[in-house]
Amino acid sequence: MGGCMHSTQDKSLHLEGDPNPSAAPTSTCAPRKMPKRISISKQLASVKALRKCSDLEKAIATTALIFRNSSDSDGKLEKAIAKDLLQTQFRNFAEGQETKPKYREILSELDEHTENKLDFEDFMILLLSITVMSDLLQNIRNVKIMK
């Protein structure tokens, strides 16, 4: 968990009135340097209250930071971004779910009504729903915890 970074997707620029939107835009300006995204582990380390937290608290804080880093200025997450996070940041829990009706229903909901966005509570429910039905959770339950 510590050291994981959220990656962002490249967004192409389309100039209004450009007859060829797929062509790369040209500019006489020097390219701007984009600030580097700070890793989740460094963001966690910067929160003083988290220094003495339990693993569970750090796990929830990590989820909250990933949500915040991916959400818009209103604190809402686009459904397409939520789906991308499931496929990139939560893939081990989602793996093997493709044939399960409930999983297909969840993905279908993310594909429909894309104008609706998720708040943090909805995002957590989404993650928990996939976790509960995942094969990985079964493997975790089978881990030996005592000698």
UniProtKB/Swiss-Prot annotation:
Keywords from the named record: Cell projection, Cilium
GO MF assignments: calcium ion binding; calcium-dependent protein binding; transition metal ion binding
Stretch list, region Disordered: 1-32
CDD domains given in the database record: S-100 (cd00213)
Domain of life the protein comes from: Eukaryota
Basic and acidic residues composition bias: residue spans: 8-17
Primary residence: other
GO cellular component, one term: cilium
Biological function: May be a component of the linker structure that bridges the ciliary membrane and peripheral singlet microtubules.
Protein name: Sentan
Organism name: Homo sapiens
